[in-house]
């Protein structure tokens, strides 16, 4: 082996390995202190790009879960208020049935009407004041709004909150009253016992209800027979013996037409009026009877929307479960790419520390090699 002074190859080699060991040690310390094995693009360019995309997705999923929970909270708030609306309507129905009883005097019916009016005011107050985050929910101003329940655009679900005020047309319908009142001596005549009711239902289908009453039936029995043949309209009789037919706006679209022998004899079709829970009047037998049909239509409308809100809440609960599952898997994938394996990294750091110490020792010895040339000069 040649002995030279100008170039110490052994020292250069030891220096190179020392630098490598120190660099590896610094990398291990950075990974252990940060908790990430990718701290810059130079560590793993592709891994950094993938982990950043996964991080964006994870953050979006977190926001989506919060949005879905807000949607559930809004639905719960609205549904809770509507539960009280249902209770009020049921009480109003009880009072209407009570007022329809023949044992009540005019004064008693007026007293019942006072409670009905107070309940109606409270129903409207609930609709006007129920809110979430300053947004009114049940007075018809909320409408349909979208809830972002995904990590990307285009993953929204619509929620519509309907008007629960008592003057909303869906909280009532149209009342048709016969022009001619029939007393207890009136009976359905043979040959004039047919009544055809033509209408369009809420699904847009044209319907014809053919009533063939039994000859000899009185006006109350006729109303009972009509109610037994269909649930699209409700028939009742007022205190003057006039037949009343109510068509709820939640069941019937547009006008109802009447034809047949009974239609002509009773004078059905010309006298009609729009009625809602806000207009019910139980101070008369006819008004009380009609009020029952109006409130039944309102209850169906409210309960139908409550069912929609219940389905919305269940859907969002499942959406949250799915989002949590996706987020868990996304974070697991990101962790495998970016997070430090402490067991592996501490082993690597120990190795680099040992190599650094060994390289330092060898470098010190390599630096002494040129001194051997002095002994040759004697």
From Swiss-Prot:
Pfam families referenced in this protein's UniProt entry, alphabetically: Flagellin_C, Flagellin_IN, Flagellin_N
Coiled coil: 103-128, 311-340
One GO molecular-function entry: structural molecule activity
InterPro entries referenced in this protein's UniProt entry, alphabetically: Flagellin, Flagellin_C, Flagellin_C_sub2, Flagellin_hook_IN_motif, Flagellin_N
GO cellular component, one term: extracellular region
Location(s), subcellular: Secreted; Bacterial flagellum
Keywords: Bacterial flagellum, Coiled coil, Secreted
Family: Belongs to the bacterial flagellin family.
Note: V.parahaemolyticus possesses two flagellar systems: a single polar flagellum propels the bacterium in liquid (swimming), while multiple lateral (peritrichous) flagella move the bacterium over surfaces (swarming). The polar flagellum is synthesized constitutively but lateral flagella are produced only under conditions in which the polar flagellum is not functional.
Subunit structure: Heteromer of multiple flagellin subunits including FlaA, FlaB/D, FlaC, FlaE and FlaF.
Biological role stated in the UniProt entry: Flagellin is the subunit protein which polymerizes to form the filaments of bacterial flagella. FlaB/D is not essential for polar flagellar synthesis and swimming motility. Homomer of FlaB/D is not able to form a functional filament.
Protein name as it appears in the record: Polar flagellin B/D
């Amino acid at each position: 082996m040649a002995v030279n002074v100008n170039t110490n190859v052994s020292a250069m080699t030891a220096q190179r390995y020392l630098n490598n060991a120190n660099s590896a040690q610094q990398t291990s310390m950075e990974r252990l202190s940060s908790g990430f094995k990718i701290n810059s693009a130079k560590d793993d360019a592709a891994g950094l790009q993938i982990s950043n995309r996964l991080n964006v997705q994870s953050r979006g999923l977190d926001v989506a879960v919060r949005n879905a929970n807000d949607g559930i909270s809004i639905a719960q708030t609205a549904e809770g208020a509507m539960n009280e609306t249902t209770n009020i309507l049921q009480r109003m129905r009880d009072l209407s049935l009570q007022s329809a009883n023949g044992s009540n005097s005019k004064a008693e019916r007026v007293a019942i009407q006072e409670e009905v009016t107070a309940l109606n005011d409270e129903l409207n107050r609930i609709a006007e004041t129920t809110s979430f985050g300053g947004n009114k929910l049940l007075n018809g101003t909320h409408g349909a709004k979208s809830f972002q329940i995904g990590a990307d655009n285009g993953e929204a679900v619509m929620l519509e909150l309907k008007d629960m005020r008592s003057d909303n047309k869906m909280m009532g319908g149209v009342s048709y009253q016969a022009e001619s009142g029939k007393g207890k001596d009136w009976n359905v005549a043979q040959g004039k016992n047919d009544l055809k009711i033509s209408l369009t239902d809420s699904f847009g289908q044209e319907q014809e209800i053919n009533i063939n009453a039994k000859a000899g039936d009185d006006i109350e029995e006729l109303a009972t027979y009509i109610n037994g043949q269909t649930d699209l309209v409700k028939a009742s009789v007022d205190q003057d013996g006039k037949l009343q037919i109510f068509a709820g706006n939640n069941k019937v679209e547009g006008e109802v037409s009447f034809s047949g022998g009974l239609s002509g004899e009773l004078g059905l079709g010309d006298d009609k009026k729009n009625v809602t829970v806000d207009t019910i009047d139980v101070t008369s037998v006819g008004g009380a009877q009609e009020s029952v049909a109006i409130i039944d239509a309102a209850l169906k409308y409210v309960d139908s929307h409550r069912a929609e809100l219940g389905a919305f809440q269940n859907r969002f609960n499942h959406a949250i479960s799915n989002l949590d599952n996706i987020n868990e898997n996304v974070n697991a994938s990101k962790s495998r790419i970016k997070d430090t394996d402490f067991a592996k990294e501490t082993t690597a750091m120990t190795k680099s520390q040992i190599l650094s110490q060994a390289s330092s020792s060898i470098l010190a010895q390599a630096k002494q090699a040129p001194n051997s040339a002095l002994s040759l000069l004697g």
